[in-house]
Amino acid sequence: MVVRIGLYRMVSWVKHQLTARNTGGHGIHSPYLFEWVRMVMSDKNSYYAWRKIEECRNKMLSDNREVEFVDYGSGRVQGESGKVKTGSGDWRKVSDIAKSSLAKKKYAQMLARLVHWLGTSYSPENSSETACGLEFRGLNIVELGTSLGVTTAYLAAVDSRNKVVTYEGCPAVAKIAQANWKSLGINNIECKVGEIDVEKLDKELERVDVAFVDANHTYASTRAYINILFGKMHAKSVLVLDDIHHSAEMERAWREICDDERVTSTMDLYQMGLVFFDKHYWKRHYVMNN
């Protein structure tokens, strides 16, 4: 099954390369999305906080501790218990988890730029009225699939006024993530541990400004998560779905998201898909390199 998924992704990558545009924004007619490409995808500036987060990533990549590992979301072969079978039973090295599950540096930093961009162009949905006018009260950010917390740290470090709620299925991995945030001095993250319950998720979430979904890589679970999140998002929200070409199931889910009447524009970066909801713009799907 692992070999089959690998071949599937290779074919998907070739198809993507044959149709993808560059990241300069050429061919994007929406001023809003053109600005998004310029400020988020094409920006190569780095920030001090990012260096600390990358030091944390490198620490995880060399961490040989073994932890009891439960994975509800990789899409790999599972045993009768629902737990993914790994080469060493239910125990894995932290370094192996880091290698297989952490978002690449460029994508994690792109997500941070996305949060920054939305925060600097905030709207009444995430503002409160004061004597001096509208005052930014922070973004509500949701992450499904915490892993070791590196991407979570990027999402949260942008602005301490933002609130990040992240969901992680494996208690041992969540514990390491929480220790990482503490060492980085990041205090605006709430981590919910355990398998994601869709009904509970629906009750817990209110307004969502940014969502990053990197959880259960099956069609049914992905669609269930997306349906809940769509109901919490507004015109200026952005949803990011990871691993959209991971398998036929994930590609099916991604195609249905692109066709959803609630969605206006989508961007396929191969590794990730981005979803926009502003009804002022024509419905359009972009395939782009990053």
What label would you give each PLM region?
Residues 2-212, 216-238, 245-290:
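A short alpha-helical cap/connector motif
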